[in-house]
Swiss-Prot record:
Key word Magnesium present: no
Native source organism of the sequence: Mus musculus
Extracellular domain ranges by topology: 45-389
Gene Ontology CC terms: extracellular region; plasma membrane
SUPFAM superfamilies: SEA domain, Trypsin-like serine proteases
Protein name, UniProt field: Transmembrane protease serine 11A
Subcellular location: Membrane
Family per similarity comment: Belongs to the peptidase S1 family.
Main location: membrane
One GO molecular-function entry: serine-type peptidase activity
């Protein structure tokens, strides 16, 4: 392993050492909001208990910084070599907080044992220029706000395909017929879910459908009755175009840490290829398998349309309003039972947006056959026209 460090003098360490540990003294002026700024932004009053609260906030800031550095290097040119980071110290200063961080990397194949400081500084500076940290007290997040999680994302601690933590993806919904999971869906309002139209190809009778919330199907956190199903007017199976539907349910849900709506992007929003995105669902773990009782999560990447439309991938099957995400080598992918579920992305203010709806693909995790998703921005006006959202 290789460790990149800052803030200490390690010039006397010998090159043959397998692990080089040093402290990263990085002024996280933008990445870490100083305690004074935090109090102002979230209107926290400093009182006689401020010492204890400050201690708790420093602990949360430590975790926040680790998460943010994870995200930075996972999305960087060093992602294949990055292992982890750890905050070894936080020092509050006048307007910000200084973080001492140890970062661990795999050594390069060339045999060089170290990576230049300028490389890491350049990546950190570029990636954090517009970033901001999570609030130290997550209970301060307004539950009415869209796209907010009650717990922070720990990016490199997600083992793709593993069960999701409680409250991690509060907009995930299970669409069920006769109490049996059929498809996923995404909560976009207190009475609306968006999903895939093909989920209702054989049965679109609202009375035979219910919605389940929470990270387990059985027992569910709560259930709701479906009142109306709106399939896109131009959806004509077996064609895969316009694979989107809206579900209206009752009674309305009250937003909480475990049930929250996702944000919808503006129609003009764009998301570049290779962006890190996340899929969740109760679907099978392999082709031909059964749906799972526990919600599972996976981290994938957006694949450009130029690549997805290549002959050996999907060719001219990719139409307007579709895009691909996953990995060409296979690995993690949506599968049977994940249809209609969310593909989400996080912005630099830790707000989550729904950018895709699980639509179709050849088998599950097959080489050169990534998942294909309905493009939410393409149908943003349609969603607004039906729901007012």
């Amino acid at each position: 392993m290789e460790v990149a460090g800052y803030g200490t003098h390690n010039r006397d360490l010998k090159q043959w050492m397998v692990t080089l540990l040093s402290a990263l003294s990085l002024m996280m002026v933008v990445v870490t909001i100083g305690l004074l700024a935090l109090f102002l932004v979230f209107d926290i009053q400093v009182n006689s208990n401020s010492g204890q609260k400050s201690s708790n906030q420093l602990k949360d800031l430590q975790e926040t910084n680790e998460n943010l550095v994870d995200e930075i290097f996972i999305d960087s040119a060093l992602n294949n070599r990055y292992i982890k980071n750890h905050v070894v110290g936080l020092t509050p200063e006048e307007d910000d907080t200084k973080a001492d961080i140890v970062m661990v990397f795999q050594p390069p194949a060339t045999g060089r044992r170290t990576v230049g400081k300028k490389t890491h500084h350049s990546i950190l500076d570029q990636k954090t220029r517009n970033a901001r940290a999570l609030p130290a007290d997550v209970s301060l997040v307004q539950v009415k706000d869209c796209g907010k999680r009650a717990i922070p994302l720990i990016a490199n601690r997600i083992v793709s395909g593993n069960p999701a933590a409680k409250g991690a993806w509060p907009w995930q919904v299970s669409l069920q017929r006769s109490n049996i999971h059929q498809c996923g869906g995404t909560l976009i309002g207190n009475m609306w879910v968006v999903t895939a139209a093909h989920c209702f190809r054989t049965n679109s009778n609202p009375r035979q459908w219910t919605l389940s919330f929470g990270t387990t199907i059985n027992p569910p956190l709560m259930k709701r009755d479906v009142r109306r199903i709106i399939m896109h007017e131009r959806y004509r199976p077996p064609a895969r175009d316009h694979d989107i539907a809206l579900v209206q349910f009752s009674p309305r849900v009250t937003f909480s840490d475990e049930v929250r709506r996702i944000c919808l992007p503006e129609p003009s929003a764009s998301f570049p290829p290779n962006s890190t995105v996340y899929i969740t669902g109760f679907g099978a773990l392999y082709y031909g398998g059964e749906s799972q009782n526990e919600l599972r999560e996976a981290r994938v990447q957006i694949i450009s349309n130029d690549i997805c439309k290549k002959r050996h991938v999907y060719g001219n099957e990719i139409k307007r309003g579709m895009f691909c995400a996953g990995f060409l080598e296979g690995n993690y992918d949506a599968c049977r039972g994940d249809s209609g579920g969310p593909l989400v992305i996080r912005d630099n203010k830790d707000t989550w947006y729904l950018i895709g709806i699980v639509s179709w693909g050849d088998n599950c995790g097959q080489k050169n056959k990534p998942g294909v998703y309905t493009q939410v921005t393409y149908y943003r006006h349609w969603i607004a026209s039906k729901t007012g959202l």
